[in-house]
Each structure stands twice: as structure tokens, then as C-alpha cells.
Amino acid sequence: MIPPCDPSPHHRSDDRVFQKSALRLNVSPYFDGFIRKISSRVRLAEEHVEAVKRLSLEGPVIYALKNKSRLNRLLIREAARRGNIPVPFWSMGEDASFADLPASVNGTQPPNGEEAASILARRESAVLQLGSSGLVHDPAVEEALIGLIHLQRHLPDPVYIVPVLISYGRRRDLQDENLFNILFGQFDDVGPVRRMIALLRYANKLAVIPAQALNLKAYLAEHERLSQDELLWQLRGELIGRIDEEREATVGPILKSRHEFIERILQDVSFIGYLKALEEREKKPLPVLLKESRRYLHEIASDYSETFIELWEKLLTWLWKNIYDGVIVDRKGLAGIREISRQMPLVVVPCHRSHIDYLLLSYVFYKENIQLPFVAAGINLSFWPVGYIFRKSGAFFIRRSFKGLELYGEVFSRYIKAMMAEKMPIEFFIEGGRSRTGKMVMPKYGLLSMILRAYQEEGMKNLGIIPVYIGYDRVIEEKSYIQELEGMPKRGERTSDVIKNRKVIRKRYGQVYVNIGEPIIFKDYMEKRGLVLDAMEDRERQALYRKISYEIALSINRVSVVTPSALVAAAFLTQDRREIRHDRWKAVLDTFRTYLASRRVPFAATFQEADKAVSGALDIFLREQMITVDDAGRAPSGQGETIYTLPGEKRLLIDYYKNMIIHYFLPLSFLSLSVLSRKEDSLPLGVILEDYVFLKKLFRHEFIFDEEKNDEDEIREELVYLADRGHIDFEDGKAPQTVTVRGNGEEALDAFAGLMRSYLESYWLVTRSVSLAGKEEREEKEWMKEIRRLGLQFHKDGELRRYESLSQQNFQGAIRFLADTGLVSLTEKEARKFYRLSGAPASLDEIRRRIFRFLH
């Protein structure tokens, strides 16, 4: 709900005043009542309301409409009333022979110059009708603009002209329209009957969207040298242009049909040249290569249908109400996306946590009147009927690997280039696949590189890259994720899986969160670094693509939401014991929450009532038996002796939610591990820094670090935090730089260190497995099974204390680290990977001992 403005002479919020002075048209009371009822559904975004209110405090507001329409004027009047923003008093730019009869000061005629000046001085509002095109001479509009310019030159305050788009729906314009849409689906520059039909057809999707306001006083000062005719032509064109930009930002560019899109690629001269060169190399006839290319394009290409979008809108609205408790969106960030989409093509790059992600952003953009992106989906989702539905909803499909598929790679690259040439917004997941662990997966930049190459080859002026965080209190795939982490092979998606998953509707999964990261405006990004794509060698471009992909991932991490379930999970997994007392768990949780608050990270809105939010998450953990409390361990209310039990097999699931926020703790966790691993009373800063660098290197395939930050500066910042809380003695800048643990500081450090110990156990286990295997070559899948069998035995014997350390993903990260250091080598035979010890066993033992030291 938008709070009303304070009543003032300049902005009247009393409905009786609005009724008296607002624009009234010569329509019947019945029609007026109908419009009022219809307009109750009109969406006027809160940020737009606030923007207009701010303008009205500085000067009078004039609403500018592109097409002359009595209906649109009524809609803007009602939207203004409902939003409690200035309501239009009269209308300008009417054709004399068809003018409505507004209730002006006299009650019958539009105000004369003196009356209009008086009205504007009181900061009353009006509607300015611009006509359909700035290229067409329109005496009535020009007369209205001349009058408005004259009034502005005699007013001390600026007059703000707010161009307004009246959107009757989100239907994209198609290059080849069907007859029904030509007759009944259009609403720009049409007569009253067809406009009314459009209103009835899209009544639930009406939106009033103000574009960027024009300060008329500043505009006249900037263009004072223009003649009157030039000024009128330019001003009218500017206002119409802003409405057109807003429309494209809302619905996107005009779409070609799928058939035309495919044929355009196949008939491209440069693509034919590529195929002829391939014909020479591979000795395949050109018609065969063309046939293969067409087959690939039919596999890849989307087949957008507005009907499916409208169906999804209804289905997803039901989903958010019945399975989730709503979607919490970053409205300021979305407003930024809208602003960028007015100026340049968009690439939206979210993280990937659930199959629902494919639909979520499109749903949010649809509701917020932002053009819908075309989403890159994995080929595993192309099975019927899901693939058909996704394709009709704007998805295009990509294979997991292009290896050995030169023609497919070229065709896919051409498809991306064609989309970029049409300024179609693209959405793809920077991690490639869904994260099975809850944390950000290392970014994949293959698709990003194709997009940036298309940007370069098409000579585009600019490109907006938008990182987006998507998070869930709980994901519906959690069970299958844990099975994969435990070593069960991933099954391909099937229609039967969708049917079986109907049982998810019997559960509640909390809230969904959408936060917008810092956009990368590519032209500005390159200029700031003095880089020019055309001047870069291929190796330099690859390094650039990789760097940008990591910056996208970092940006997503910075806006990831601390949810109650993530904080509850983190507090449970700091220790390796099966049981934990409520008081100890709550103390750890409060320690973590205090630290996160000091770092000003985003918290879920439910933390406004923190105790209630935590209790709610705890209840879910108990209800889902992720933790248990037996009768003997349940204390009477208020005694604080309740004991929670963590079943070993459930720790992997709890670990998933802990990992959602673990990146916020990395510097402090590494520091705590270093301090606790040493027996000295006073530890030199240099020793801590050495351990910190080692741990960053060890986990370079697990976590995304900001390489632009100085390691020592990060450590000092965390030491100052611990010292301020009384956990350690440390005086920054005072020699010698040493750290001494104070009082109960060891307990706090142990909590932070505990967040990383499952990863350390995983890596230690892999080094043990390599040592036991010696120089023997191991096939990857079989080796992973052996590591898990060994880990289960060590866990049973007590050598491994955390069941969550038996994670396939962690094993893979450890293997990549050992390959980086040259301790294991990788060979590929017939698309299978084989590993063997290739470094000195003593070097491997040294790493294993160093990891072990952090565990004890």
C-alpha cells in the first residue's frame, strides 16, 4: 500500500478535491463506472508512483500520451487517483472537431491562457496528447505545445512532462501477424472500437507505465537556439520516442517467426561460405551439411507463443501461492533493469538452483512489465511435452558439450549472433547446470564468449549484462540432489518424473528470492580498463571472458540472501557431534547473525521478526526429520536444555542449506582454522597469512574469490572484527603483528572454523585415496566409488567425523586441485577419464598432513 502524501497547496490528496477538479469527459455515468471498475486492475508500480510524487513537489506534472484516445485519458485519470498522484485537470492536443468537453474552471470549455497559468501555478495536472507520430504534422498538438512552452517561460517552477505508456498486455509484436491479432490484438493507433476490444481482451493485464520525465524548463534552456518549428518538431519527437522506448523495454523488439529466423541463418552468405569450406575439409556434400544445419537449428530454436506465456502466468501464480509463500523481488534492481533495457540489449545471467529457475525470471519480468528474455535451457529438458512447452515459452536448447561437433558449435554460435542482431534479450545460467551443493558453482563462460563475439561482430553500441541471484528457502529437488552427492548416477529427465513430482504440491517450500547484482555495462567496462575487443588476441579474449564470468558470479554472491533455513543449518553443522544442546546451537546462530549483520549482507525479509523466522525454520527441520528431538531430550519450556540430534544421513541435506551462505564466512573461517591449528599463545600475522593463501589455493575449485582484494587487507579486516568483539587481542598497525586468543574467543573461532571442516575432510580423504592407489591408473567413475567406500569405512571408524564430507562434488574439487599441482595426471581414452599419481609421494604427504593439521 502506498501511503498518501501530506496535504499541501501543491499536492492535494483529498478525493473530494480530485473529484471536483479532475478531468471529466462527455461519457455516460455507466461507461465511467465501467472504466473505474476496469482500472482497479491497472498496475502502477510503486517506484513509478514515488517518482511522480517527487516531481509534483518541484513543479506541475503533465502526462503525455502518444495516441489520441478518450479511453486512455480515462485510464490515466483513474490510475492517478488510485496512486494518489496528481490527477489530470484538463486535456491538451485535442482535434477541434472531436474534442471532448472537459470540466474546466468554467465547467464547459478548456481553460484559457490566464486560467491555465493559474492552474499550473497551483501545480495541477493535465494530459497532453501527442498523436501517433512525430513525423506527421498535427496542428492541435503543436498549438498545445506552443501554449505549454509559453506558460513554462512565465513560470518559476519547471513543468515536468511525463510520457506515459498505456500497456494493454504483454503481447510481442510479430513480423507476420495473424488476422485475428491484426483485427483485435493491436492497440497502437487504432480506433475506439478496436481499442475497446483490446481493453476487454487484456483487461487483467492493463498497466500504466511512466517513461523518463522531461524537465521542460531545462529542455528549453538547452535548445534556446532552435526556431519554434524546430523546437516543436524535436520536443514532440523526443516525447514520442520515450514512449516507444518504454514499449520496447516492456514487450521487446518485433519478432520474426521461427521459420524465418532459421532460414535467415541458413541463407546467410558468410554461413554458406563456412559450409563450403567445411565441405572441402570433410568431403561432405553441401546439401548434406545444409540438412544437418537445419536439423540442428530445429533442435535449438525457440518458437515463442504469447498464448503459452499467458498460460504460464496463471500456472505460476498458482504455484507461488500453493507451494511457495510468494516471491520477494528486488524492486530497485528491477527498475535498474528496465532503465538499461531502454538503452541497450540485455543479457540476464542468474545462478541456477532449481528447474523452476527457467520460469521464475520470466514470470517476474512479466509481472513487472519488463521484456521477457529468451532462456538457454539444457537439451536434457527437450523431452516431450516439457520441451515443447518450454520452446513455446521462449526457451532455446543447448547441448552440454560441443566436443567433436564442429558444425553444431558453428550453428549454435550463428543462432546466438542472429538473436543479438535482433536485440532479443537472452537469459543463461552462468553455472551451466544446477548447483547440487547450494553454493555457487564455478562459472562456465562458453555461452558468454559467444554472446560477446556476436557483440563484436555485429558492431553493437553497448550491452547490459545483469547478474541475478535466485534463492529458495527450500528447493523441490533437494532429495535428488542428495542422492547425486552420495554417488547415485544422475538420471535423464523424463515425463514420468514430472508426474511423480505431483506430491510436491502437498508441501510448503517457503519463499523465493530474486536479487539483482551490479550490472556490467560492457562498453563502460572495456573503456575503464582501456581494452578494445578488436585489438585483442584470442588468448586475451578468452582471459577476458573468464574474468567477466567470475565477476558475474561474485556479483551474484554479494546479493545472495541469508535465509532462516541457511542460518539454522550453518549453526547445526559447526560441530561434528551427533547431538547439540539448544543453548549452544542458539549461541552459534546469534554469533553468525551478528557477523553477517556487521558485513551488511542481504537478509530475508522474515528476519524483521528474527526469533519467529528462526523458530519457523527450526520447525521445518524438525517436521522434515532433518533433525530430531526425542522425549528424553525435550526440555520443559523455558529451561533451555533441549538436545537436538542430527542423523548422519541427513547432514548432507542440512549442508546444502548451509552452503547457500558459506561464501560470506570464507575469510573469517580460514583465519579461524589457522589460529586454532597452532599451539602458540601468540601467533604472528605472517603465519596466518601463509595459511590463508594456502587455503585459497586449496579451494580454488570450490569457491569464488575476489582476486582484486588484497589477502592481507582481508585478514586484517577480520582480525579487527574479532578484536572488537573481545575474542582476540590484535592491534592493527602496532608492531609486532600478533594474534592472541582471549577468554571464550576459542569457542567463537571454533564455530567459524567448523563451517569449513567438512571440505577439509573431503580433501584429506581424496589425498589418502591417491596414496593408497599409488601409480595405478583409475577410471574416474570407478575411482569416485572407491573414494566413497573408503570414506564410509573411515566414517565408521571415526577417522572422518562429518558425514557431509562424503560428497561427490567435494571429491571432484579435490581431484582438480591435485591435477593443478601436478600430483595427479589426467588422460582421456574413448571419452573416459583416467587418473594416476604423477607427482612425488612426499609432496602429496605434505599436503595431506597440512590439511590434517586444520582438522585437529
Predicted regions, residues:
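Membrane-interfacial terminal anchoring regions of lipid-handling membrane enzymes
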Residues: 1-856
